[in-house]
Amino acid sequence: MDIDTYKEFGASVELLSFLPSDFFPSIRDLLDTAFALHREALESPEHCSPHHTALRQAIVCWGELMNLATWVGSNLEDPASRELVVSYVNVNMGLKIRQLLWFHISCLTFGRETVLEYLVSVGVWIRTPQAYRPPNAPILSTLPETTVVRRRGRSPRRRTPSPRRRRSKSPRRRRSQSRESQC
């Protein structure tokens, strides 16, 4: 069974496969980043977002893989076989977990649309012959000027008033305090 864990987020395994394996930080660094930025949400019994849920699942999965590797290390007597299993887990499963952690941490940090745009631009950059592409690959932290990353529940601030709105020269009148606040 071939399940694409990125499908519900608008991405795919193929889209992430354009990034070389050495692009992704170590699992330890990714776990440290996830907990530094999102500890409260990850440990909360409340549902925060699909990205938080996916992060939790990836962290639990990695923990179970480490339990398996420890068990194999303790119970498999043939050193060559033991090394093969541990190497397979670290290389193949480790890469998949690193990709998952990176994707969801990046989506929470920069926004899903920005991350998807980045993955597409890196894919185009990699497939463009070297003679025709810029020397440096796109960088995720360099957000395009048109991209706006908003926090949940807050509306964007206006920089200039709407041209149709008339500005009064008189001081602003306050609404009556008798009304109860409305949320």
Curated annotation (Swiss-Prot):
Residues 149-176 have a biased composition (Basic residues). GO terms for molecular function: DNA binding; RNA binding; structural molecule activity. Sequence repeats lie at residues 155-160, 162-168, 170-176. The modification Phosphoserine is found at residues 155, 162, 170. Phosphorylated by host SRPK1, SRPK2, and maybe protein kinase C or GAPDH. Phosphorylation is critical for pregenomic RNA packaging. Protein kinase C phosphorylation is stimulated by HBx protein and may play a role in transport of the viral genome to the nucleus at the late step during the viral replication cycle. It is found in: Virion; Host cytoplasm. A motif (Bipartite nuclear localization signal) lies at residues 158-175. Transmembrane segments: none annotated. Residues 155-176 are annotated as: 3 X 7 AA repeats of S-P-R-R-R-[PR]-S. Residues 143-183 are annotated as: Disordered. Keywords: Capsid protein, Cytoplasmic inwards viral transport, DNA-binding, Host cytoplasm, Host-virus interaction, Microtubular inwards viral transport, Phosphoprotein, Repeat, RNA-binding, T=4 icosahedral capsid protein, Viral penetration into host nucleus, Virion, Virus entry into host cell. Self assembles to form an icosahedral capsid. Most capsids appear to be large particles with an icosahedral symmetry of T=4 and consist of 240 copies of capsid protein, though a fraction forms smaller T=3 particles consisting of 180 capsid proteins. Entering capsids are transported along microtubules to the nucleus. Phosphorylation of the capsid is thought to induce exposure of nuclear localization signal in the C-terminal portion of the capsid protein that allows binding to the nuclear pore complex via the importin (karyopherin-) alpha and beta. HAMAP family: HBV_HBEAG. This is Capsid protein. It comes from Hepatitis B virus genotype C subtype adr (isolate Japan/Nishioka/1983). The gene is C.
